[in-house]
Amino acid sequence: MARKGLIQREKKRQKLEQKYHLIRRSSKKEISKVQSLNDKWEIYRKLQSPPRNSAPTRLHRRCFATGRPRANYRDFGLSGHILREMVHACLLPGARRSSW
């Protein structure tokens, strides 16, 4: 189980990313439209004004059940460890166990 503080930090980053998403997107569109280098630099400065944690690259997928940051399956939102346990317990419809 991940520490509670790390999970809360990730939730805070998600909220910040949603809050500043439109500002970042509009600034990036402006950069592609503007031709002059000085205007581009002004827009780049404007793009750097939101907090760092609002950047989408700072987000990290975590397991829905445990908060584990590694080995996550996007389709389920679970880490491989928990996914395997749930499949063996028949809690995920449509998932098949592998046996070899």
From Swiss-Prot:
Bridged cysteine pairs (disulfide): none
Alphabetical UniProt keywords: Chloroplast, Plastid, Ribonucleoprotein, Ribosomal protein, RNA-binding, rRNA-binding
Protein name as annotated: Small ribosomal subunit protein uS14c
Function per UniProt: Binds 16S rRNA, required for the assembly of 30S particles.
Gene Ontology BP, a term: translation
Alphabetized PANTHER family for the sequence: 30S RIBOSOMAL PROTEIN S14, SMALL RIBOSOMAL SUBUNIT PROTEIN US14M
Major localization class: plastid
Assembly description: Part of the 30S ribosomal subunit.
PROSITE patterns tied to this protein: RIBOSOMAL_S14
Protein biosynthesis listed as a keyword: no
Protein family: Belongs to the universal ribosomal protein uS14 family.
GO molecular function: rRNA binding; structural constituent of ribosome
Pfam families reported in the protein's UniProt record: Ribosomal_S14
Gene: rps14
InterPro entries given in the database record: Ribosomal_uS14, Ribosomal_uS14_bac/plastid, Ribosomal_uS14_CS
